[in-house]
UniProtKB/Swiss-Prot annotation:
It comes from Serratia proteamaculans (strain 568). This is Tol-Pal system protein TolB. Keywords: Cell cycle, Cell division, Periplasm, Signal. GO terms for biological process: cell division; protein import. PANTHER family: PROTEIN TOLB (PTHR36842:SF1), PROTEIN TOLB HOMOLOG (PTHR36842). It is found in: Periplasm. Pfam families: PD40, TolB_N.
Length: 430
């Protein structure tokens, strides 16, 4: 947890003030059929009201995962604050087999001691399945709640939690000197801050695997350019600004290389830069357009979009070049893919019969599942644990962010109030 604190501290030091209206998760489908769980309000052992409702944050995290449906406080048979106070039979009568209890205690030094226990009410009634405590300052309260959520989620599902992750996205505001903003927020929309403002479009943010940098496309020089910005100090490094198109950056899994698309020689083609030496290697060639690279987790291959067969489809190629292999066959066209961190599936924008939705393809069987039913869906990005996808869609006259689980059952949106929101990118574990 100390290492994760150091990563997040880089954000807090530089971006101390949170600006603009924040996005918030609004669940639209799937929570009612999720696994019920009890998350009891954490006991506050100080005067007045607590600075953060830790139990509420933990409950929201578990609900937002799409895998749990926390019971309403009004329906709770009891409100214990420690494992010894839990009456298992009272909870199992409501179909609940696990309960989270906890406490928040202010310290004389201005800090807070947060503790929780996850209690089994069914398999081995009264057994503590997981527990922890954190001593934090006020600015770390939400982070510590997300930490507890991660631990509870992993204990109950066997899947690493992703509640301490962030999302990057571009907001186009209405008017002003700098109508384009690259922003970063916690996965749930809280603690939003602005990374970069521009009078010209910003596009395609991509996280480095350690979460310390963002690559993106800017048009501030009058033409497209690829840059990498360090979040801790705001330093910007220009990667490519060739004639015509420079776009679609993607960091390799080890962070040593950056793949992108250039059209300096005519057609769009894939290139890879060694970020240490600055050497650029061309990966694809020919008259077709090849763009939107995404890395396989071994760092040896890329999936990408190509119209070499007439319409855009997803192909695979070695990161050192060579012959390509077509991956997608269903739908009139498929593009803008992202490979999951375990390499077992990819998500993509799939078009068929005039509809444009986010689809998932199993890379072993080739089976395809359409995940969304929203309008003009674009730019999917997968959570690092592979359970959720964030993407943008058209709603009314603008673009908003949407969430869908990778089984298609859970859906939510993250509406913004101060502009159109596009190009979401989910961070790695932080």
């Amino acid at each position: 947890m100390k290492q994760a604190f150091r990563v997040a501290l880089g954000f807090l030091i530089l971006w101390a003030s949170v600006l603009h209206a924040e996005v918030r998760i609004e669940i639209t489908q799937g929570v009612d059929s999720a696994r019920p769980i009890g998350v009891v309000p954490f006991k506050w052992a100080g005067p007045g009201t607590p600075p953060e409702d830790i139990g509420k944050i933990v409950g929201a995290d578990l609900r937002n995962s799409g895998k749990f449906n926390p019971i309403d406080v009004a329906r709770m048979p009891q409100q214990p604050t420690t494992a010894s106070e839990v009456t298992p039979a009272a909870w199992t009568a409501l179909g609940i087999d696990a309960v989270v209890v906890g406490q928040v205690q202010p310290g004389a030094d201005g800090g807070y001691l947060i503790s929780y226990q996850l209690v089994d009410t069914s398999g081995s009634p009264g057994t503590v399945l997981a527990q922890n405590q954190y001593k934090v300052t006020k600015q770390w309260l939400r982070y510590s709640a997300h930490t507890a959520s991660d631990e509870v989620f992993e204990k109950l599902t066997g899947i690493k939690g992703a509640f301490r992750t962030r999302i990057a996205y571009v907001v186009q505001t209405n008017g002003g000197k700098f109508p384009y903003e690259l922003r970063v927020a916690d996965y749930d929309g809280y603690n939003q801050f602005t990374v970069h403002r521009s009078p010209e479009p910003l596009m395609s943010p991509a996280w480095s695997p350690d979460g310390s940098k963002l690559a993106y496309v800017t048009f501030e020089s009058g033409r497209s350019a690829l840059v990498v910005q360090t979040l801790a100090n705001g330093a910007i490094r220009q990667i490519a600004s060739f004639p015509r198109h420079n776009g679609a950056p993607a960091f390799s899994p080890d962070g040593s290389r950056l793949a992108f698309a250039l059209s300096k020689s005519g057609s769009l083609n894939l290139y890879v830069m060694n970020l240490g030496s600055g050497q650029i290697t061309q990966i694809t060639d020919g008259r077709s357009n090849n763009t939107e690279p995404t890395w396989f987790p071994d760092g040896q291959s890329l999936a990408y979009t190509s119209d070499q067969g007439g319409r855009p489809q997803i192909y695979k190629v070695s990161a050192s070049g060579g012959a390509s292999q077509r991956l997608t066959w269903e739908g009139s066209q498929n593009q803008d893919s992202e490979v999951s961190s375990d390499g077992k599936f990819l998500v993509m924008v799939s078009s068929n019969s005039g509809a444009q939705h986010i689809a998932k393809q199993d890379l072993g069987s080739g089976a395809v599942q359409v995940l969304t039913g929203t309008f003009l869906d674009e730019t999917p990005s997968i959570a690092p644990n592979g359970t959720m996808v964030i993407y943008s869609s058209t709603q009314g006259m603008g673009s908003v962010l949407q969430l869908v689980s990778t089984d298609g059952r859970f859906k939510a949106r993250l509406p913004a109030t101060d502009g159109q929101v596009k190009f979401p990118a989910w961070s790695p574990y932080l």
